[in-house]
Amino acid sequence: MKTAICLENLSYSAFSKEVISEINSYVTNSIDEVCLVTFDETMPFANVNAAVFAPNELDSFHNGIIISHKINHAMSTLGCSNNSKKVLYLYDLDWMIEPMMYSDVYDVLTDRNLNLIVRSEDHVYPIKNLCNREPDAIVKNFSLEKIWNSL
């Protein structure tokens, strides 16, 4: 399935490692298009067996799935004028760590054009408490197939 995954950058983090490992193992035996979109350009900490694009390319990413993992990336994807399905895979509850505008977080989490997937059952209560929305799915480890099947 045609998929773009948004990352902050390609430097080392637990989530980047998980995503790059998943992509590299998936594209080895698949003809599906999978690419990365990075919001900050950095040197990758590992080989990436997929195309890497800048965020401005998302407007021309049609008929696919765009997966973001941060609230601010989800805001960017929701603003794209394409017909791709938008997914927020909440790896961490970043709005509780980084200072963010409550209205921005609320608007993203309550947007019905965004499929909401969380990594842990521990994320369900804060989301429900903040915006009275249940996640569409819980996917414990980042897996393209599990995310696709949950949509």
Question: Where are the model-predicted features located?
Answer:
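A short, active-site helix/loop in glycosyltransferases that binds the activated sugar's phosphate group
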Residues: 76-77, 114-135
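Short, polar loop motifs at secondary-structure junctions
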Residues: 37-43, 69-75, 119-125
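N-terminal pre-catalytic "stem/leader" segment of glycosyltransferase-like enzymes
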Residues: 1-62, 136, 142-151
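Short hydrophobic/aromatic-enriched beta-strand-loop microsegments
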Residues: 85-91, 134-142
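N-terminal cationic-hydrophobic initiation segments that often serve targeting/anchoring roles
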Residues: 24-28, 78-80, 128
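Residue-level marker for well-ordered alpha-helical positions
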Residues: 20-21, 103, 121, 125
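Extended catalytic core of nucleotide-activated donor transferases of GT-like folds
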Residues: 43-110
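Short internal beta-strands
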Residues: 33-39, 89-90, 116-119
